[in-house]
Regions:
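N-terminal accessory segments
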Residues: 1-31, 62-64, 305-322, 422-427, ...
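N-terminal flexible segment immediately upstream of the FAD-binding catalytic core
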Residues: 1-57, 74-106, 259-271, 321-345, ...
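C-terminal substrate-recognition/cap domain of FAD-linked oxidoreductases
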Residues: 22-28, 215-216, 225-228, 235-408, ...
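Short, ordered loop/turn segments at secondary-structure junctions
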Residues: 23, 70-72, 135, 257, ...
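FAD-binding subdomain of flavoenzyme oxidoreductases
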Residues: 97-253, 466
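Activity-critical C-terminal alpha-helical subdomain
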Residues: 176, 437-475
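Short acidic/histidine-rich active-site segments
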Residues: 426-433, 468-470
């Protein structure tokens, strides 16, 4: 069937929920980093799970691919269509309702298009905490967070999106609706099917709603910004913090000195919490269920022990919420500062925590072997072994230097990933595979593991219509 006939049929079947003019499509065809731009027949905006199922049936009959999309905030090109054009983008933006908050069961159920910040606010209104927190929380969606198994800054205490999910509602590639929205913490009646869809990036099913865990809101919070001489000292500080704070340690971020300097350079009003420059910094936070006095006592004891052990060279403890927010501003503005500064090659990797210092040294040697003058910015959630290892050109680089870096991207990423693999790490910690890494994962996963993944994809989606070319390379 010609594309114009397909679009006419789509508009007739889903009146008022289909757009195909260029201006409406444009924001949905290019990814957040403006690295990938695709084509599509139309943008579908269903209002309900039943609409999604009907749309899947319609696409299946006509062999039209579907690219599910939440907030389109991903960093690996996972939610924008390819250049083929014989597809639709399925936006879940209209399906954004908070369906239920059960403060006694400590659960919340929401549609997949609910913005993460709105989910957090709904929990707060019930005097509860939904702890998934990341830089894009004002625009990313719950469905997208689950589809990519998002991490964020509090994984150390609460886990990834996968760990926070109790149930899902999913439309499968055959157009069936699976309602698994059970708010149970124990259910031993067979396979835990929801785990197949979490982190699958919409390749096995379209998440339409989810039931997630809530937690009591903490009575007090403590935040510190500490200077450390090297990454190994940061790892030692993490171990010390876990001893002193136990489960109340909620965040532990490592930021390299050059990364902090970049934020101070490009972010108006940003100030370093400590006066002297250092090679590395740690941003750590604890949440206490008892009282502010109890939290302060434990936190100050930790920092005193860290100074005595020569792990920390300088530190500031936030005395107000505003001061804590200013500490976090350094961390949250890093991606924006890098964008202002110029292009960079991003890596989202995870490692055994004990090998983080070793990795940073080895990866720097490997990268400089490919691009000798490259600047390297290191930051990330060291408490769970996740580093963002980004490579850029020297300050003041001209167009030829950026082109040289672009030309070397495959070699640079290969050098970084080879070091990750030697240390039993992962080339994708929290951002997903998308288009960026779909060609790389086969090199770093066992062949039988890739074969099992491909078998699962064929079982669920034999026609290959759900987010093709993501996670598993398209046939």
């Amino acid at each position: 069937m010609p594309d114009d006939d397909i679009k006419a049929s789509l508009r007739a079947a889903f009146q008022g929920r289909v757009l195909d003019d260029a201006d409406a499509l444009a924001p949905h065809l290019t990814d957040y980093r403006k690295r990938w731009t695709g084509r599509t027949l139309a943008l579908a905006q269903p209002d309900s799970t039943e609409d999604v199922a009907k749309l899947v049936h319609w696409c299946r009959e006509r062999r039209v691919a579907i690219y599910p999309q939440g907030g389109n905030t991903g960093l690996v090109g996972g939610s924008v269509p390819d250049g083929d054009g014989h597809s639709i983008v399925l936006s879940l933006a209209r399906m954004n309702a908070i369906l239920d908050v059960d403060r006694y069961n400590n659960t919340l159920t929401a549609q997949a298009g609910a913005v993460l910040a709105n989910v957090q606010e709904a929990a707060a209104q019930a005097d509860r905490l939904f702890p998934l927190s990341l830089g894009a929380e004002g625009s990313c969606t719950l469905g997208g967070n689950l589809a990519t198994n998002a991490g964020g800054i509090q994984v150390l205490r609460y886990g990834n999106a996968r760990d926070l999910c109790l149930g899902l509602e999913v439309v499968t590639p055959d157009g069936q609706i699976w309602n698994g929205l059970r708010g149970l913490r124990k259910d031993n009646t067979g396979y835990d099917l929801k785990q197949l869809f979490i982190g699958a990036e919409g390749t096995l099913g379209i998440i339409t709603a989810a039931t997630v865990k809530l937690y009591p809101r903490p009575a007090a919070q403590m935040t510190a910004f500490a200077a450390v001489p090297d990454p190994q000292s940061a790892v030692q500080l993490l171990s010390l913090a876990q001893s002193y704070l136990s489960a109340s340690l909620t965040a532990f971020e490592l930021i390299s000195g050059p990364a902090v300097e970049l934020v101070l350079q490009h972010t108006p009003g940003a100030r370093s919490p400590v006066p002297a420059k250092a090679p590395y910094y740690v941003l750590l936070e604890s949440s206490d269920a008892e009282s502010a006095a109890h939290a302060t006592e434990r936190f100050e004891a930790l920092m005193e022990a860290a100074f005595e052990a020569d792990i920390v060279t300088d530190a500031a403890i936030a005395s107000t919420l505003a001061q804590s927010a200013s500490f976090w501003q350094i961390r949250h503005h890093l991606p924006e500062a890098q964008s202002i500064d110029g292009e960079n090659i991003k890596h989202d990797i995870s490692l055994p925590i004990s090998r983080i210092g070793e990795f940073i040294d080895a990866a720097q040697t490997a990268v400089h072997g490919v691009l000798p003058n490259a600047r390297i910015f290191v930051f990330g959630h060291v408490g769970d072994g996740n580093l963002h290892y980004n490579v850029s050109t020297p300050p003041g680089a001209d167009a030829s230097a950026y082109q040289a870096m672009r030309n070397s991207e495959k070699a640079i990423s290969g050098a970084v990933y080879d070091v990750v693999a030697r240390m039993n790490g992962s080339i994708s910690a929290e951002h997903g595979v998308g288009q960026l890494r779909v060609g790389s994962i086969g090199r770093y996963k066992p062949a039988n593991e890739m074969a099992m993944m491909a078998s699962i994809k064929r079982l669920f989606d034999p026609l290959g219509l759900f987010n093709p070319g993501r996670v598993i390379a398209a046939d």
